[in-house]
Amino acid sequence: MAVTAAQVKELREKTGAGIMDAKRALVETDGNMEAAAELLREKGIAKAAKKADRVAAEGLTGIAVNGNVAAIVELNSETDFVAKNDQFVALVKETAELIASKKPATNEEALALETASGITLEAELVQATATIGEKITFRRFAVIEKTDAQHFGAYQHNGGKIGVVSVVEGADETLAKQVSMHIAAMNPTVLSADELDSEFVKAELAQMNHKIDEDNASRVLVNKPELPHHEFGSKSQLTEEVLAAAKASFEEELKAEGKPEKIWDKILPGKMAKFIVDNTKVDQQFALLAQLYIMDDSKTVEAFLESKGAKAIAFTRFEVGEGIEKAETDFAAEVEAAKAGL
């Protein structure tokens, strides 16, 4: 039977298939719309299966807020070009909204959710893989909840390559969003330095001091003074005994310099503050509250928020592709393989 343009248009709107794929499906099923849609679905699963072993490390984050619930998701594609595709962008948005609405606990639960199309999210991804032509995957999500007294800071950077949701108490959405902008830029991994494992701190401190050794090797060559090692890396290592010893050392310095004791109280706080800053570098790299705030680097994030009567409660930061090992493509080898008919 002859297939009309109206039938092709209807099937494309229903399935997202290309013009020729829709037309062929209608021809094969004698114009039966439901059968044609099922045929396209089956072909889509087959196409998706062929792409299953490909690495999808590009993509976008998506954020949706539904009252006191926010969701952040990451969907991946194989190329950045597809990540900018309107269908992919819409799929990311729909997925974030679905997660915020249904609050699944696991990826398995999320993939089983019914979408606006009446099919599961998993089926929607298979369909997208078939119609877009690249492997599309749902990698991860987080559901974040707050109270009425708290605010979400939702922020996406670089077109959605980085997504952040923060929860801030005692502030408005503007300040909460600024905190999320800081998180996007500075990439903290924990809220407070108290969350950093002691062995992790030791390992990071050793790496920092190794970097100082490398820098010092270069500085010696140009007759620059060597930089000192950091003795400590975290506030958790600055015990009362350590701080007392540092204070005593500074007092000895002031005494040796001939500074009268009556002015020591004006000098010591500054020296102690610098000692703490110099010996909490691991905290400053990984803990949000210990980092210098990018909007006012005279204060830590914690101190800045306190000055505004606010407090950071939690945050989640996704960066597209982090932790995914991308396949390295040797273009010359691909050309040679094509020539050889491999």
UniProtKB/Swiss-Prot annotation:
> What NCBIfam families is this protein classified in?
tsf
Q: Which PANTHER family match?
A: ELONGATION FACTOR TS, ELONGATION FACTOR TS, MITOCHONDRIAL
The record's principal subcellular location, in a coarse class, is cytoplasm
**Family statement:** Belongs to the EF-Ts family.
Identification of the protein by name: Elongation factor Ts
Location in the cell: Cytoplasm
Entry annotated with the keyword Signal: no
InterPro entries per record: EF-Ts_dimer_sf (IPR036402), Transl_elong_EFTs/EF1B (IPR001816), Transl_elong_EFTs/EF1B_dimer (IPR014039), Transl_elong_Ts_CS (IPR018101), UBA-like_sf (IPR009060)
Tell me a Gene Ontology molecular-function term this record carries.
mannan binding
Sorted keywords for this record are: Cytoplasm, Elongation factor, Protein biosynthesis
Q: What does this protein do?
A: Associates with the EF-Tu.GDP complex and induces the exchange of GDP to GTP. It remains bound to the aminoacyl-tRNA.EF-Tu.GTP complex up to the GTP hydrolysis stage on the ribosome.
For this record, an example GO cellular component is: cytoplasm
The UniProt entry, under SUPFAM superfamilies, shows: Elongation factor Ts (EF-Ts), dimerisation domain, UBA-like
Region: Involved in Mg(2+) ion dislocation from EF-Tu; residue ranges are 79-82
